[in-house]
Amino acid sequence: MSALKRVIWPQIILFGDSITQFAFQANGWGSELCHKLERKCDVINRGLSGYNTRWAKIVLPRIVPVSDAPISAVTVFFGANDCALEDKNPTQHVPLQEFSENLKDIVRFLVSKGVSNDNIIFITPPPLLEADWEKECLLKGSPLNRLNSVAGQYAQACVQAAGESGVDVLDLWTLMQKDGQDFSVYLSDGLHLSDKGNQFVAEHLWTLLERRVSDLPFILPYWGDVDPKCPESSLLCD
């Protein structure tokens, strides 16, 4: 009997901080992507809570490639920690210009590993609800260490870096505040996403991802198409 051809699932890699790490929780935006891409693609979570782009750039070569499977898309979702105020949270803070260069370096590395620019999507940090996040900080014995206006500067830098790198971008900071809407419904603690926030990200990200994955086939035959008398003829064919 000839060697069996291994079935390879294409991959979508989610690379980011805690907002990505938590994306596979119930009602998370990553979980929604998994649901949409069942039997077509593996959605791989590489979210690292608390990380900034400085640390992300260092560990990226240890994360990508995951395997020899083709990569259909990579999301790069940082900025919520980079934008921490330097005088209040120097550990996570990354200066604005360095943040921008780190994002571009991440793209260069991914491209060097065979990921096309067209398959990379930046996601900006969401807006920050300062009153709610201050409560979280005070519970930990710290003063407010982020500002929405500063998060906006990092979001703008992310959008600009995306343009300079030739990659797509989902500008959450702008979209969640569009037309003066109450963005508090999108946040659970002033920084991280609520169920509605996760739904918002999933819906808007899917509009960018859909064309990149629309041609992915259903992997392995539908059960009703398997020949019950000789299943091998259905299941072992290329």
Swiss-Prot record:
Its EC number is 3.1.-.-. Coiled coil: none annotated. The active site is at residues 18, 189, 192. Signal peptide: none annotated. It is an enzyme of class 3 (hydrolase). The record marks 50, 81 as: Transition state stabilizer. GO terms for molecular function: hydrolase activity, acting on ester bonds. Keywords: Hydrolase, Lipid degradation, Lipid metabolism. Belongs to the 'GDSL' lipolytic enzyme family. IAH1 subfamily. Probable lipase. This is Isoamyl acetate-hydrolyzing esterase 1 homolog. It comes from Danio rerio.
